[in-house]
Amino acid sequence: MTDEQYMRRAIELAKRGMGYTSPNPMVGAVIVKDGRIIGEGWHERYGELHAERNALKHCKESPQGADMYVTLEPCCHHGKQPPCVEAVIEAGIKKVYVGSDDPNPLVAGGGIKILKEHGIEVVTNVLKEDCDRLNDVFFYFIQTRRPYVAMKYAMTMDGKIATYSGLSKWITGEKAREHVQNLRHRYKAIMAGIGTVLADDPLLTCRIEGGVNPIRIICDTHLKLPLKSQIVNTAKEVSTIVAVSERYRENAQSEALPDTEKDSIEENNNYQKNRKITRLEENGIEILYVAEKNGHIDLNDLMQKLGERSIDSILLEGGGILNWSALKSGIVNKVYAYIAPKLFGGADAKTPIEGMGTDSPAHAVMLGNSKVTKLGDDFLIESDVVNT
């Protein structure tokens, strides 16, 4: 096998940690001696052994004098686990092949430097693009402290996400819907607008056996979330954050004495708002107060607050209005577009991105690094957002 083939195997191993390692990266490691793989490992779950230590732990024979292939630069700092460079040095590894440099300020070349100082030869940038793509979420979050946002929608070939009557089940087939469940497992959180909740009463959970439910984030400026919705009824089992305008809190907390009948009505409304907040919190909902912009949740302020909660990635399953707001705010990093070979027609049928839109093709949101995958009868186009 070639160096690239060994690294390809390490990438395959790393992907087994998908959905379980956040906010840590996915990492795989392969140990080779005399042309034979003698040990393999990956970072299986956040807080547990890193890939290098797992690979050493599972060696079939002594790793003394062996080579190691690892998708990400070995760490050199103490966290929930001790530095991996120490384990590599102690094991007597003679050469390390690295896929990606680690942009974490606590590492940032330090791991490679220490290995070299101990006489270990280091080869970098082996399948770098593939290894970088493996951890696009981690790289973005560690450098910005904001969630990596992937917009997802399913539409017909004429660009409709529902019929003119509002029906949308199902646009795509079973394989495409299974792929969506994998995304829900992969991303730390899932975000939708209150319009989607009111229209569909969704659960927004991962339905893969053994999968991880994403944290649910509902953008709900004026707190219209029904107390009897599935979101509320399952909030004690599935972590749920409802993003509400700070103005809503200010109104709810108003204690001005009523001077007129109008004031009395307003005071009663504020009492009802306070009561609803209390009942939602009693049901396990976290209310997150966010700045308001143009009558809606300020998505950049929301991203800042979610990043502070170590939410490193979000799958955006919004309607047309929220999707446009997200693009206009510049928070979207990636787009997953599932396209079904169907035509709905209808001038009033909803589209995946609504709002005002752009005034000129020259001002379009540009996408790049596109990849097309066939899923049953449907197609998935994945693209990175190049500019907003």
Where are these regions (language model features)?
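Short capping loops/turns at secondary-structure boundaries
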Residues: 104, 108, 124-127, 142-146, ...
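Enzymes that bind and transform nitrogen-containing heteroaromatic metabolites
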Residues: 3-8, 13-17, 22-24, 80, ...
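N-terminal glycine-rich anion-binding loops that anchor highly charged ligand groups
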Residues: 21-34
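Proteins enriched for Cys/Gly/acidic motifs involved in redox and nucleic-acid/cofactor modification
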Residues: 20-23, 112, 126-154
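Zn2+-dependent cytidine deaminase-like catalytic core
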Residues: 31-130, 215, 327
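A broad detector of short, well-ordered amphipathic alpha-helices
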Residues: 8, 12-15, 39, 50-53, ...
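Generic structural signal for helix capping and beta-alpha/helix-loop junctions
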Residues: 105-106, 132, 323, 345
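Short acidic/polar alpha-helix capping motifs at helix-coil junctions
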Residues: 18-21, 46-51, 75-79, 142-145, ...
